[in-house]
A protein has these predicted regions:
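Glycine-rich phosphate-binding loop of ATP-dependent small-molecule kinases
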Residues: 1-398
C-alpha cells in the first residue's frame, strides 16, 4: 500500500491557485493524472482519493497556529501563498475533482473539522473502496479496451516487409565514420547534460539482430557517468507484484542523464502476447497506456528514441549457427532462441500491430535494417545525434 500526502495533484493545484500555470496547462495535467490512474486501476490497483476539507475560518486559524511552530510544520512558498488565497485554492481543488472524478478513481470529500470524524471517515472510505474492488474481481469484470484500428486494417499492413535489407557498409568507411560520430555524440550528450535534457533509448528487434553491439557502440560515445544500460528479461516476483510499467518507471533518467533499455515495456505487446503470458484484454489495453507513458516522457524534456533492429529469417539462422560453432559465442544462444524462431510469423504480426498503434508523432519507431551490423550501428548513432541537435536547438530558442 502506498500513501501519498498531496499526491500528484497537490503541486498542480497550488501552482494554478497561485497563477503560475494557466488553465490549459492545468487541464493538461489533470488529463495526464486521469490517464495514469486509469492505467493503474486497469491493472488491479485500488485508488482512493481523499480531499480533506476545512472551512475558511477554521483553516485560517489552524494555519496561524502552525506558522508559530515552523520548526515542526515545514511550509513551502506555495503552501503559504495558496493558504492565503483560500477561495482560489478551493476553486482549483473543485475543478481538479470535477475533471478527475471517475468510476475507477473516484474522489471522496471529507469534512476535516473534527479529527475523530475525519479519521473514521478516511478509514470507511478505504474499506469501502477495497471491498468494492474485491467484489468486481469476483465477478471477473473485463475492462473496456480502446482501439485505434480495425483487425482488417492491421492485416493489410506489414511495416517489416518494406525494409530494404540489402545495404552494406565497407569496413574502412565504417571505422572512420563511427569514430567521428562517437566523438560528436560525446560532445552533444555533455551539452545535453548541462542543459538538463534527458534521453531514454529503447531497443527491440529479433534475437541476434545486433542490439547488444549497437548499444556498445552507442555507449562508447557517452560519458559513463551519465549513462546506464538496463537489460530487460522476465520480471521478478517483486516486479510482478506491481503494475507492469513499474520496473521501467524506476529507471527513468534524471535530468541530463541517459538510460538505454535492452528490450523494453513493449514486451507487453510482443512476447507476452505471443507466449500468451497476458490476457488479450490486458495487452490490447497496453497500446494506449504505452502511448500515454511516452507522451509524458517527451513532455518532460526527455528525448525518447525507439529502435527496432530488423533482419531476415535466413540471416538470423546464420547467426544462430555461428553462435553454436564459435566457443566464445556459445553463451549467446539458448533453447528459447530456437523456440522463438519457430514463432516468427506470430512475432511479425505482433510487431506490425505495435508499429501501427504506437508509432506516434512524439515517439515514432525507427526500423533499422540490421542485416549488416555496421550499417545499423551507424544509423542508430546518427539518429540519436540528430535528436540531440534538435533538442539543444529548441532549448536555445526558449
Amino acid at each position: 500500500m502506498g500513501v501519498f500526502l498531496g499526491g500528484w495533484y497537490g503541486g498542480t493545484i497550488r501552482r494554478f491557485c497561485c497563477g503560475d500555470i494557466d488553465e490549459s496547462e492545468f487541464n493538461a495535467s489533470m488529463e495526464r493524472w486521469r490517464r495514469l490512474e486509469h492505467t493503474l486501476a486497469s491493472s488491479g490497483t485500488v485508488i482512493v482519493k481523499l480531499w480533506l476539507h476545512l472551512g475558511k475560518k477554521v483553516q485560517k486559524a489552524r494555519l496561524k497556529d502552525r506558522l508559530k511552530h515552523q520548526e515542526i510544520h515545514h511550509f513551502t512558498p506555495y503552501d503559504k501563498k495558496s493558504a492565503e488565497n483560500y477561495d482560489g485554492l478551493v476553486s482549483a481543488a473543485a475543478k481538479a475533482i470535477t475533471l478527475t472524478d471517475r468510476v475507477d478513481a473516484p474522489w471522496t470529500v471529507i469534512d476535516a473539522y473534527d479529527g475523530n470524524f475525519r479519521n473514521a471517515s478516511v478509514a470507511r472510505a478505504i474499506i469501502a473502496a477495497v471491498e468494492a474492488a474485491v467484489a468486481v474481481k469476483r465477478q471477473n469484470a473485463v475492462p473496456v479496451v480502446p482501439t485505434k484500428a480495425s483487425e482488417e486494417e492491421i492485416g493489410q499492413i506489414s511495416a517489416l516487409d518494406a525494409i530494404d535489407l540489402s545495404r552494406t557498409c565497407e569496413r574502412g568507411v565504417y571505422k572512420k565514420e563511427l569514430a567521428e560520430l562517437q566523438s560528436e555524440l560525446y560532445d552533444l550528450t555533455y551539452k545535453a547534460y548541462k542543459k538538463g535534457i534527458s534521453s531514454t533509448i529503447l531497443f527491440e528487434g529479433w534475437d541476434a539482430a545486433g542490439k547488444g553491439g549497437a548499444i556498445r557502440r552507442l555507449t562508447a560515445g557517452i560519458d559513463a557517468r551519465i549513462t546506464r544500460v538496463i537489460p530487460v528479461s522476465a520480471p521478478t516476483d517483486e516486479e510482478l507484484a506491481h503494475n507492469y510499467l513499474w520496473r521501467f518507471w524506476r529507471h527513468i533518467p534524471r535530468a541530463g542523464f541517459v538510460t538505454i533499455y535492452d528490450r523494453s515495456w513493449y514486451g507487453r505487446v510482443l512476447v507476452e502476447r505471443v507466449e500468451k503470458l497476458t490476457q488479450p484484454e490486458d495487452w490490447k489495453r497496453a497500446y494506449a497506456e504505452l502511448n500515454d507513458f511516452e507522451e509524458q516522457l517527451q513532455e518532460h524534456n526527455n528525448i525518447l528514441l525507439k529502435f527496432w533492429l530488423h533482419i531476415s529469417p535466413d540471416e538470423q539462422l546464420r547467426r544462430f549457427k555461428e553462435r553454436e560453432e564459435i566457443p566464445w559465442k556459445n553463451y549467446k544462444i539458448t533453447p528459447d532462441d530456437w523456440r522463438n524462431r519457430e514463432k516468427w510469423p506470430a512475432y511479425v504480426e505482433a510487431a506490425d500491430e505495435m508499429f501501427l498503434r504506437t508509432s506516434t508523432e512524439y515517439a515514432p519507431w525507427h526500423i533499422i535494417p540490421a542485416e549488416d551490423k555496421k550499417c545499423a550501428r551507424l544509423d542508430v548513432i546518427r539518429i540519436y545525434r540528430d535528436a540531440l541537435r534538435k533538442a539543444l536547438e529548441q532549448k536555445k530558442k526558449k
